Amino acid sequence: MANLRIIKRRIRSVRNIAKITRAMEMIAASKMKKAQERGLAGRPYSEKITEVIAALAALPQSGEILHPLLERRPVKKIAILHITPDRGQCGGLVANINRKTGTFIMEQKVPVSAVVVGRKGVDFIRRIRQQMRAEFINLGDKPDYLDTLPISRVIMDDFMSGEIDQVFIAYTQFVSTAIQNPVLEQLLPVMPVELPPGQNLEYIYEPESATVLNSLLPRFVEMSVYHAILESIASEQSARMVAMRNATDNAKELIGELTLVYNKARQESITNELLDIVGGAAALA
């Protein structure tokens, strides 16, 4: 009977856990839809400003000094913007992006400092004893563009002052509900992409193209950081929903297995009691 009570207690515990994971799955699903909409809505703007900067950089300039964010110099120190969630329970997402950043840091032959977004990233950078330039936590599930400006300002100020010579950004790119890819890209100096052959954006710029380019570059960096954070949040909520769904399914499967064990043990207990009764009756006869 003691064994039956233990099994019954385990079934009750697993059932309670299943209720919690189911509730977390539903919450994550609600947040995921909103996060996906915000992340996907920012892609056209990000793509267009990248395209315009590429077109501007390809135009002949009038000799005006270009923005410091375009300056390429010998790399003596690198910074990496490491974007992670504040909370766990989102499958392998945190481990994957931390591994991406950790591998990158180990491969560098020059000092690397980290600007970290999210508690999980802060814990990771501290654990590997890496220099941390700044940390930003508790941005929430719906950060505004203005909320992320201090992050990009730290990076741009350090780069333009010569404190660092190159900046990379590590974040999780949202592909679909089931797929989220860890991505590492160069952020500074800004490297204008090459336009496809024959694609010529014949805009008339007022004032001069160099002035427009210099005005757009800080905005480009700020939007790149903001968009990467939105992508990471969409990925986080998607991964958490899938992880909680899997946890709920596993809990249901475990409940089924424990119920089967409980029924077998109960049947065995009843059989033994019947045998004892029959044996006692036979002894009295």
Swiss-Prot record:
Q: Which residues form a coiled coil?
A: none
Q: Does the keyword Ion transport apply?
A: yes
Task: Give the record's subunit note.
Answer: F-type ATPases have 2 components, CF(1) - the catalytic core - and CF(0) - the membrane proton channel. CF(1) has five subunits: alpha(3), beta(3), gamma(1), delta(1), epsilon(1). CF(0) has three main subunits: a, b and c.
Q: What is its main location?
A: membrane
PANTHER family named in the record: ATP SYNTHASE GAMMA CHAIN, ATP SYNTHASE SUBUNIT GAMMA, MITOCHONDRIAL
Membrane topology according to the record: Peripheral membrane protein
Q: Name one GO biological process term.
A: proton motive force-driven plasma membrane ATP synthesis
**Keywords (A to Z) from UniProt:** ATP synthesis, Cell membrane, CF(1), Hydrogen ion transport, Ion transport, Membrane, Transport
- Give the molecular function GO annotations: ATP binding; proton-transporting ATP synthase activity, rotational mechanism
Taxonomy of the source species: Bacteria, Bacillati, Chloroflexota, Dehalococcoidia, Dehalococcoidales
The job of this chain, per UniProt, is described as: Produces ATP from ADP in the presence of a proton gradient across the membrane. The gamma chain is believed to be important in regulating ATPase activity and the flow of protons through the CF(0) complex.
Similarity annotation: Belongs to the ATPase gamma chain family.
Q: Which GO cellular component terms, listed alphabetically, does the Swiss-Prot or TrEMBL entry include?
A: plasma membrane; proton-transporting ATP synthase complex
Give the signal sequence positions. none
Q: What is the name of this protein?
A: ATP synthase gamma chain
**Location of the protein in the cell:** Cell membrane
